[in-house]
């Protein structure tokens, strides 16, 4: 029987944790601040103190061999020559309330480390010391207990005997899973064209010899070939051969998680003996069963019955779920179990993930530095990563590592706090003053168009360039200064220092006045401050600082321009990663921005008959900003020609809502007989579903939808058959010119001379190709893609077209388009 690998912390917390979920303010960032304090205490101990000592030992309980491992915070020998295991804990509990028996898990961890180290070193006795560091007062309290090795071994053995039934369940499951997955057959009678090739690439990546940073694979495969099954099936087969312990299926949006769930359901339906557990992790806000009056989760034992006593009941819930035989733990299943056992569905999903084989969730569970799954990714593991819609990852990753803070947050906090003097009020005023001076400095360096620095300043004082009234705050040298926006390569320390100084009094106030009316507003401020300070600690040459003055406000953004080192570090936590999409062109761009320059990249050709796709371009139309007004009527005429060629459903994609509205107003005025539907901004899930429902099969009347490229209908939408028979794409999708995009352009110009491509052309064309991919979804589909912009005829754009677009026809005018469409539908 293979040994059961068991981390010390997992063993102790699983068996001994009790009580409730309590997310009330605790005054510090446990993960980051706690680690910093650990290092501080370890350094202060002097010579002879070994920090972060890895320990591992073999034990047996109930016939099960265990490998127990973990890192002891510290080990040293005291003046009496006794070996001491030091367990360090940071806490917000007041020093007077810190008790020796405050948390049994803390002693248990130290005692297990003592058992491992004692046997390893042949010791007869040793001490366990609990070191508590009170984060508000810097008080250090220490408690010491004396043990014989025999006592520690007995304690560890008792824990293992309690854990043995769970280990036995999991070992039996893994054996059953291995047999099942190694014999797993493809769930369809035959592979679609392209599926076998894609599956083979993924299987080879997952079964390749492990490397320090993991194997990386980029797969571009046409829309409609069945990418989800083509990557899931080989990855599961790899787990069946012993290559990979868990599979993480990571998505850009909740709507694509269902594709993974459906693929796994198909595998289960095709093999009744399939042993596979899958869990879908959904954001807490969406699954909360007991939100507060404002609709937010209230994770406090006195407010939420699902939080109260959670740890006393969760193991019972886990046992029931693991024994029920279904193995499918989606959002609905977790909600049902949460109600049955009165446990939080969000936390239940996280705890259940440790017992599941496939974990489906958002990108942020791996890549986000704040919310990633620490239980899996704080150290490397035998994990397989499947990254869906990977073309979305560069922008999502940039957002995850960036942060913003506004002066208005300080103003609102001061207003909420009310009148009176306090340490917090003083700190708020200092920070507010620094941001006020920062706004003056930005307005001086970069007056908004049509204004002066004086008009930007609402303080009642004049601060024109060259005047005697100079801003009292110094900003780093500006790389860009225009229209109220300044970019700097260096951190604006003069703004960050008062925010850092604000942290302690803000923590104190939040802890001392939890019931104050202003608590919610100041708690929001605290998290905003922490977010920008965390980003400042990551800040290096891959970032830029943006300061924007608008009216009385100043916004500070620390922008991650290049997320490659951070994505690389995240992917290195696993054995292998396959990043796939219908649009990863050019591959070198995606490999560079995602930190995988040496990764293998494959591009599969479309399996669909070229004659089923009518592909036309009207290069006589220019959609450049200066020609927008002149383009409206020709675009309307082209859309009318498309929508009138055959009764059916069509989509027209635009680069912006404003442009969309202009054309829609002209179109509906001139072609009122053609039904239209407009994508509104900010649609929720219900609005999205309602929009798509209008695209019904076998329509009796033509419907032309107006949508935005790169939005919720421009990708990730499956309208097969005659639910969609044509789309028009207006423009080449370039992001709007902005200071941020210009900084991206400058950054990559300096890196490789391709700044315009990285900041504008390639992201824009990705949106174009994604939108075009909505039309042909199956072998039987037939439809039209119409490109409206003269730049599609330029080689810099045309070379980005996929191979199956080789039959694209450039037409003179709308009349020729009408004739071509008539011929296409007649075939």
For the regions a protein language model found, what residue spans apply to each?
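Mg2+/Mn2+-dependent nuclease catalytic core
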Residues: 57-154
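Conserved pre-motif I regulatory segment
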Residues: 173-220
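A contiguous, basic/glycine-rich beta-loop/short-helix subdomain that forms a polymer-engagement track
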Residues: 334-359, 369-376, 505-622, 630-632, ...
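Conserved helicase motor "Helicase C" RecA-like lobe of SF1/SF2 P-loop NTPases
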Residues: 655-680
């Amino acid at each position: 029987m293979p040994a059961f690998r068991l981390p010390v912390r997992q063993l102790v917390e699983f068996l001994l944790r009790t009580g409730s979920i309590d997310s009330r303010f605790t005054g510090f960032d446990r993960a980051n601040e706690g680690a910093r304090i650990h290092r501080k205490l370890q350094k202060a101990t002097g010579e002879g103190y070994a920090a972060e000592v890895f320990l591992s030992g073999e034990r047996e309980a109930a016939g099960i061999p265990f490998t127990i491992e973990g890192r002891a915070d510290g080990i040293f020998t005291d003046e009496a020559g006794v070996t001491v295991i030091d367990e360090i804990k940071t806490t917000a509990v007041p020093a007077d309330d810190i008790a020796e028996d405050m948390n049994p898990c803390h002693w248990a961890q130290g005692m297990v480390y003592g058992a491992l180290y004692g046997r390893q070193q042949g010791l007869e006795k040793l001490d366990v010391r609990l070191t508590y560091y009170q984060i508000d007062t810097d008080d250090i309290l220490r408690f010491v207990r004396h043990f014989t090795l025999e006592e520690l071994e007995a304690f560890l053995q008792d824990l293992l005997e309690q854990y043995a039934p769970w280990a036995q369940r999991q070992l039996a499951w893994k054996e059953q899973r291995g047999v099942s997955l190694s014999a797993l057959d493809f769930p369809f009678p035959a592979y679609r064209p392209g599926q076998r090739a894609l599956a083979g690439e993924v299987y080879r990546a997952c079964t390749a010899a492990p490397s320090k940073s993991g194997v990386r694979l980029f797969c571009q495969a046409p829309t409609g070939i069945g990418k989800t099954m083509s990557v899931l099936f080989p990855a599961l087969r790899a787990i069946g051969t012993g290559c990979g312990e868990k599979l993480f299926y990571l998505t850009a949006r909740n709507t694509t998680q269902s594709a993974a769930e459906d693929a796994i359901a198909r595998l289960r339906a095709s093999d009744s003996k399939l042993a596979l557990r899958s869990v879908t992790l959904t954001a807490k806000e969406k699954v909360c069963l007991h939100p507060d009056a404002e609709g937010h989760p209230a994770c406090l034992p006195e407010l939420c019955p699902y939080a109260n006593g959670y740890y006393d009941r969760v193991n019972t819930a886990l046992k029931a779920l693991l024994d029920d035989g279904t193995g499918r733990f989606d959002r609905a299943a977790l909600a049902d179990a949460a109600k049955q056992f009165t446990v939080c569905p969000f936390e239940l999903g996280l705890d259940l993930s440790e017992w599941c084989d496939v974990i489906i969730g958002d990108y942020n569970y791996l890549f986000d530095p704040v919310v990633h799954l620490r239980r899996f990714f704080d150290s490397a593991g035998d994990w397989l990563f499947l990254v869906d819609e990977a073309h979305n990852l560069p922008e999502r990753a940039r957002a995850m590592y960036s942060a913003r803070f506004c002066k208005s947050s300080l103003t609102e906090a001061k207003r909420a706090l009310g009148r009176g003097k306090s340490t917090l009020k003083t700190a708020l005023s200092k920070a507010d003053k620094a941001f006020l001076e920062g706004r003056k400095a930005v307005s001086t360096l970069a007056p908004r168009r049509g204004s002066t620095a004086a008009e930007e300043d609402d303080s009642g004082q004049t601060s024109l360039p060259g005047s005697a009234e100079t801003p009292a705050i110094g900003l780093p040298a500006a790389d860009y200064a225009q229209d109220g926006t300044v970019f700097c390569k260096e951190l604006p320390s003069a703004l960050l220092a008062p925010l850092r100084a604000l942290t302690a009094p803000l923590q104190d106030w939040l802890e001392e006045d939890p019931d104050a009316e202003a608590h919610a507003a100041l708690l929001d401020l605290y998290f905003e401050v922490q977010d920008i300070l965390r980003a400042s600690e990551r800040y290096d040459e891959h970032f830029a600082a943006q300061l924007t003055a608008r009216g009385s406000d100043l916004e500070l953004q620390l922008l991650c321009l290049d997320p490659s080192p951070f994505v690389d570090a995240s992917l290195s936590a696993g054995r292998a990663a396959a990043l796939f999409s219908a649009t990863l062109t050019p591959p070198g761009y995606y490999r560079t921005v995602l930190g995988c320059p040496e990764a293998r990249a494959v591009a599969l050709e479309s399996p669909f008959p070229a004659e089923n796709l009518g592909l036309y371009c009207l290069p006589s139309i220019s959609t450049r900003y200066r020609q927008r007004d002149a383009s409206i009527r020709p675009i309307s005429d082209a859309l009318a020609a498309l929508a009138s060629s055959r009764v059916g459903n069509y989509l027209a994609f635009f680069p912006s809502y404003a442009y969309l509205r202009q054309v829609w107003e002209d179109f509906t005025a001139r072609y009122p007989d053609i039904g239209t539907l407009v994508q509104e901004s900010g649609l929720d899930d219900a609005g999205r579903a309602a929009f798509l429902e209008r695209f019904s099969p076998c329509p009796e009347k033509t419907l032309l939808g107006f949508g935005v490229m790169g939005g919720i209908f421009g990708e990730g939408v499956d309208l097969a058959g005659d639910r969609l028979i044509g789309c028009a794409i207006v423009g080449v999708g370039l992001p709007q010119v902005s200071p941020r995009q210009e900084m991206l352009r400058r950054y990559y110009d300096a890196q490789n001379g391709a700044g315009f491509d990285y900041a504008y052309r390639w992201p824009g064309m990705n949106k174009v190709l994604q939108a075009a991919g909505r039309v042909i979804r199956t072998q039987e589909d037939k439809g039209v893609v119409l490109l409206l912009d003269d730049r599609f005829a330029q080689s810099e754009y045309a070379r980005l077209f996929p191979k199956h677009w080789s039959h694209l026809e450039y037409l003179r005018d709308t009349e020729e388009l009408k004739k071509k469409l008539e011929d296409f539908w007649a075939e």
